[in-house]
Amino acid sequence: MARLARVVSPDTPHHVTQRGNARQFILETDTDRLVYLDLLRRHGALHGLGLLGYCLMSNHVHLIVVPARHDSLRLALKHTHGRYAAYFNARFASSGHVWQGRFYSCPLDLPHLWAALRYTELNPVRAGMVADPAAYHWSSAAAHCGDDLPGTALESNARIRGH
């Protein structure tokens, strides 16, 4: 049976999640996270994917993104996750899948955008890693609170339809 086509609405925020294969830790070190963010920013810029929010956990990622075109989401994440898998496998002299299946994505209306951002940025609080979401270096919470931590710069000019 063929899988259903992904629903992508250009200029609309989307919540994206992707988990490590078999829930393995794939973003363990600061270097891993910096590599992932660099790839995401580079391929996002190349393929028209704006980044509004994110949280990088050890075994999964949450992204709030805005695709400029119907193929922006697919292409940016294909190249980001493909290149990250190559980095990860080279680091561990391994081969095979790094990510578990397809990434999940869902278009968001404005009320759901704020709920998804809260959910995303509260992930490390729920996991007991920090008490304040802005204290977690690997999410967009600090940037949204006005702190200028390295690695938290977001796409400020992502166009959102109707807003």
Where are these regions (language model features)?
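Glycine/serine-rich anion-binding loops at beta->alpha junctions
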Residues: 60
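Short Pro-Cys-Gly-centered "Cys-loop" motif that presents a nucleophilic cysteine in a tight turn
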Residues: 1-57, 66-163
